[in-house]
From Swiss-Prot:
Annotated InterPro entries: aa-tRNA-synth_I_CS (IPR001412), Arg-tRNA-ligase (IPR001278), Arg-tRNA-synth_N (IPR005148), Arg-tRNA-synth_N_sf (IPR036695), ArgRS_core (IPR035684), DALR_anticod-bd (IPR008909), Rossmann-like_a/b/a_fold (IPR014729), tRNAsynth_Ia_anticodon-bd (IPR009080)
Protein's UniProt name: Arginine--tRNA ligase
Taxonomy of the source species: Bacteria, Bacillati, Bacillota, Bacilli, Bacillales
Protein family membership: Belongs to the class-I aminoacyl-tRNA synthetase family.
Stored SMART domains: Arg_tRNA_synt_N (SM01016), DALR_1 (SM00836)
Quaternary organization: Monomer.
Length: 556
């Protein structure tokens, strides 16, 4: 529990006692007291609507109730500096500044752990994201999903959730058959032999490279073997080649997974048919027109869904159900799937399947990643300058940099369309959001280095009561919000809230820096306090950037 949370608990307890004294209720009769941080700092550090909540019980106007509570609140409490009534009965609190300066040694001590909390209470979440077919390069939608999924996992972990990250490898189905046939054609081509390229084949440069690799590895060994033997071998090589490429690209993007789950393993370990039988036992399977159906309309889907076609082949839905059953059987409390915009219509049937399996539909959450459009100098960019083809994740990173790519993709809610301004992302000005935040970190690092050169080290023992300017208090207030912002971003599955916070923190630091001299050799005690203060800002900026997979540079 952080200092701010401790103060909130103390304040709530004090409000409860004031209500008991002023209104004459027993403690157990006092409704839950909610504290909000006013948007306008002129309205205090916290506000509560408890007087409105008590109006019916006390049979009085909320403002009248508030007027009876306030005198009790002012009694014997060092935390509160001032209390006022606003509007119809809101009670606004201004806290004593000592509660802010107490933050500094705490942040210095917690360092990389600052921002952590037990908010999630160890609840087990699995986040499955990216899960692109292993048949080509990652595109911009995958990149946005990767940035958001990885950031969300980092945020939820810091907020006290037990989080596992998973990539579902779609290594079964027609797309893999087409990959193998494409690799086979390029293999023959690399050997100088004629071969008909499959109509639905993959024509990317990576498949040409794969064909050359196969030719170099096997020579003409598989020219005269049976198709079955050749394609069986090439399937293994092609999947290893493509998944290896995906892993490398994601690793470069600072995205890691705890589990790479193979769709093929569902068949090899006989996980598909038991899922079907469970649905049948629960009474939601029926046969019609030679096909096997799942009655998802029982769970608000707009129509029932085919699981096995009349020719005996499975639809994509059946192994997807088996996969989600497997996840739940692994003991996760909640599954978060991060899907592309084209999967929006898939949500009702998947939630219906979860319920038909006997689980709560609330155990599946789906975050939709909306489309990304690239712009440069105000003009939409559709093709890569380098390849003349669609822009890939790799292309974008090479063009604007890894940090800018990660940060920009986290800036907007995932369910909104995104116009990615490459010109802005490459800009070295304060108009560039990631540059603005990173520059604040680098500037602090520079000041700390200068202080060290003059023999001044950051110490927890500095006299923090010397921090008395408005800009210092404003910076401390923003610093104190970090753990709550992390918990809120985790709860709302909203990495963009961390981006917003970092911008606010950088702004608060710049305001402080522009109005306060940090290194003042004629006033060493104040200098020591301010060095400690900016060190806490540096720590918090770094921790926030780390959540987003963005570096915190010492120099720029």
């Amino acid at each position: 529990m952080n200092v701010m949370q401790e103060n909130q608990i103390k304040l709530i307890a004090h409000i409860k006692q004031a209500v008991v004294q002023a209104v004459g209720l027993e403690e157990a009769e006092v409704p839950e007291i909610l504290l909000e941080v006013p948007k306008d700092k002129k309205h205090g550090d916290y506000s509560t609507n408890i007087a409105m909540q008590l109006a019916r019980v006390a049979k009085k106007a909320p403002r009248q109730i508030a007027e009876s509570i306030v005198p009790e609140l002012k009694k014997d409490n060092k935390l509160i500096k001032e209390v006022e009534i606003a509007g119809p009965g809101f009670i606004n609190f201004y806290l004593d500044n000592a509660y802010l300066t107490d933050l500094v040694p705490v942040i210095l001590t917690e360092d990389k752990q600052y921002g952590e909390s037990d908010f999630g209470k160890g609840e087990k979440f699995q986040i499955e994201f990216v899960s692109a077919n292993p048949t080509g390069d990652l595109h911009l939608g995958h990149a946005r999903g990767a940035a958001i999924g990885d950031s969300l996992a980092n945020i939820m972990k810091m907020a006290g959730f037990d989080v596992s990250r998973e990539y579902y490898i779609n290594d079964a189905g027609n797309q893999i058959n087409n990959l193998v046939l494409s690799a086979e054609a390029r293999y023959f081509e690399a050997l100088g032999l004629d071969s008909e390229f499959p109509e639905d084949g993959y024509r990317g440069a990576d498949i040409i490279s794969l064909g050359k690799d196969l030719a170099a590895k096997y020579g003409d060994k598989y020219v005269h073997t049976s198709e079955e033997e050749r394609r069986s071998v090439f399937r293994v090589d092609a999947l290893a080649f493509e998944t290896g490429k995906l892993r490398a690209d994601l690793e470069e993007f600072r995205v890691s997974f705890d589990e790479w789950f193979s769709e093929t393993s569902l068949y090899e370990e006989n996980k598909v048919l038991p899922a079907l039988e469970r649905l049948r036992e629960n009474g939601y399977i029926y046969e019609q027109d030679g096909a096997t159906w799942l009655r998802t309309t029982d769970f608000e889907d707009d129509k029932d869904r085919v699981l096995i076609k009349s020719d005996g082949s499975y639809t994509y839905f059946l192994p997807d159900i088996a996969y989600h059953l497997n996840k739940l059987e692994r003991g996760f409390d909640v599954l978060i799937d991060i899907w592309g915009a084209d999967h929006h219509g898939y949500i009702p049937r998947m939630r219906a399947a979860i319920e038909a399996l006997g689980y709560s539909p609330n155990q599946l959450e789906v975050e939709i990643i909306q489309l990304v459009h690239l712009f440069e100098d105000g003009v939409q960019v559709k093709m890569s300058k380098r390849t003349g083809k669609s822009v890939t994740m790799r292309d974008l990173i090479e063009e604007v940099g890894l940090d800018a790519t990660r940060y920009f993709f986290a800036m907007r809610s995932s369910d909104t369309h995104m116009n990615f301004d490459m010109s802005l992302a490459k800009s070295t000005s304060n108009d560039n959001p990631v540059y603005y935040v990173q520059y604040a970190h680098a500037r602090i690092s520079s000041i700390l280095r200068s202080g060290k050169e003059q023999g001044l080290e950051v110490t927890k023992d500095a006299d923090m009561s010397l921090l008395q300017t408005e800009a210092e208090y404003d910076l401390l207030k923003v610093l104190g919000e970090f753990a709550d912002v992390v918990a809120e971003a985790a709860t709302k599955r909203a990495p963009h809230r961390i981006v917003r916070y970092l911008n606010d923190l950088a702004s608060a630091f710049h305001r402080f820096y522009n109005s306060n001299k940090v290194l003042d050799m004629d006033n060493l005690e104040v200098t020591k306090a301010r060095l400690a203060l900016i060190k806490t800002a540096q720590i918090t900026l770094r921790n926030g950037l780390t959540l987003l997979g963005v570096s915190a540079p010492e120099k720029m």
